[in-house]
Amino acid sequence: MANKKMILYQLKIDKFKDSNETGYGDYKGLLLQIKYFQFLQIDGIILNNILDYYKNAKSLAEIESKYGSILEFKKMINIYNSNNIKMGINLDFNNLRDTFNNWKQAKILHENKNFTPNQTQKNAFEKYIDKNNKENDIFLNQTEFLDFYNKIFDFYLNLGCNFFVININNENSKNNNINEKEIDLIKNIYKISKQKNESFEIIIKTKNHELHKIQASQKEKIYDFLFIDKFSEIGSDKTYKNKLMIKFKPWQLLKELRNYLSYEDVIISLASEHIGRINSRWGDELAFNKEASKSFALLLLAARNSANIYYGDELGLLKAKIEDYRDFNEFNYNETKRYLETKNISTDIFYNSYLYQHSISVNNIMPWNLEPNFGFSKIKNKKFIFAENSKQNNVVSEFNDPTSSLNFYKYLIEFIKNKDFEEILNNGKISFSKDVFKKGIIKIKYKLQNKKLLFVINISKKSRKIHLSKKYEIIKSTYHDKKYLNIPNSLDPFESLILLKK
């Protein structure tokens, strides 16, 4: 995967596809959907850390009845690998001690699978589980954490996984600067991983490109890719830890993205698992939902950077359909509401922000079709949270609609992998026009000899005047049915173009 632009797809296993009518997405369910990723031509998939399933588990049956067995997970991984799709794990170093304890619990349950839960607790639990209550700081005791990492690495390597996305962001940190201890840890992680398996990829999740500058000053590599998803926070009030929604300013997103678009080893994710759907927060929930989703696809895929698609965004999914505040399933909901009331923030503003911002909007069930539970599960009498436009924007409906967001994603991925455009995309000089940022527009231009390829991406809800050379030819638009007799002098809301000049 190194030194080559790649397209990743991030998902939650338990929300993706249920194969056994338990109401939980499982390993077999994910395997059943392999053709979906072949259709999209995805290079790799980021999975949630399955060791989390073992937290407080009393028996293997409890886990395997929901998600499947470790052998089923390994089979699923191997089949994806044999189809040239890499499989990786999202690993949060802020919770590495918890992951290590979960690994030990998994070890206990597998070693004692013929015992009763009480026997397992008595004979093995105390022996293995780490009850150390030290502060969970990955940089305080590096030796200990490297030991944790070794065990977890071996576990996933033996299951056939190909890469880690390692989160080193500390939410409690007062700044995003990387210190010497952090750099030293990253170096050691990379060295350990490559010694065990040279082809295993280390992707570091960070909030800025400082590591990119540090890498340039090093004699040896310290990571394979950077992963940045901080952009999802734009349009949120950081004063209240992203609980409140503020006005989205398209130019702000373009300005932030500009620094990362030139690098194949930087993976950009517009969305993240921690905050609501970008199609609702940044796009248009009414007339221009489809066009907005396509424009975000262009923003993600048109430049030289690698990219991560968060599951459901390729369908143009909107925020979750919430019927009651209890659907948020948040223990401190009322406490947060009362606190914000003391700051003169009304209940209506608070609740509306939750509808758009809450992570449940990006972590609900994947809609496959119009069958019960949108094809996610055949279980009856169980309530699921789903996107409010799942009836219109599910995989089958999108697949059958040539104007859909899903088919536009497929077109774009095929386009950037097309041999006819490979040379200019890989070897052409890339430039970005900043003069139209204030309008919510970015121009990404590739030039190779006399050939020019231009992406004009409008993420504004308003029509915008724009000047484009009449020598270009339009080869694709986010407005599927619009007929262009000439190069336009203005763009409609979320109207974005791909143009070519030979």
Task: List each model region and its residues.
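Active-site and adjacent substrate-binding regions of carbohydrate-active enzymes
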Residues: 1-472, 476-502
